[in-house]
Amino acid sequence: MKTMKKYIKTAFFCSMYWLIVQLNIANLGTRIPDKYFRQKYIIFKSFNFEKHGKFWNKWFYVRKWKHKILDGHQLNQNIYDQRHLMTINTDEIEKMIIETKRAELIHWISILPVIIFNKGPRLVKYINIFYAMIANVPIIIVQRYNRPRLTQLLRILKRRGERHD
């Protein structure tokens, strides 16, 4: 019984830790000016093996589950609400590309706090590593899947000269 209480207490504190840390990271991430995401940083580059996002769908079937991921705007009003995308024009697509970069960065950073559990009991460490991965990696994959497709759409719109709706 004493051991069970200890596990429940540990689970509660771990849950509170993740809630506070991830909400703060997301909040700070939304404050990064868009101009930083307009730069061409290597982390956001689509690599050859990704084949413009096709890799992610071939190996992880992204199209089948990406719509089931909770929209971050529901938890944090500062996060871009994709439902406001009423028209497809270059300005909106550029904003969506910026937001895929922002979301990817936020979720990479959100994995890092797992380091605090490094010295903890093995079970606690493994559970928290699992949580950090399962809560963040799917969102990173979706961003890496969507961004090349949005970039291609942006190229097409710019070629056609469709600047505004």
From Swiss-Prot:
Residues 1-28 form the signal peptide. The keyword Cytoplasm does not apply. It is found in: Cell membrane. It is a single-pass membrane protein. Keywords: Acyltransferase, Carotenoid biosynthesis, Cell membrane, Membrane, Signal, Transferase, Transmembrane, Transmembrane helix. It is an enzyme of class 2 (transferase). Belongs to the acyltransferase CrtO family. This is Glycosyl-4,4'-diaponeurosporenoate acyltransferase. It comes from Staphylococcus aureus (strain NCTC 8325 / PS 47).
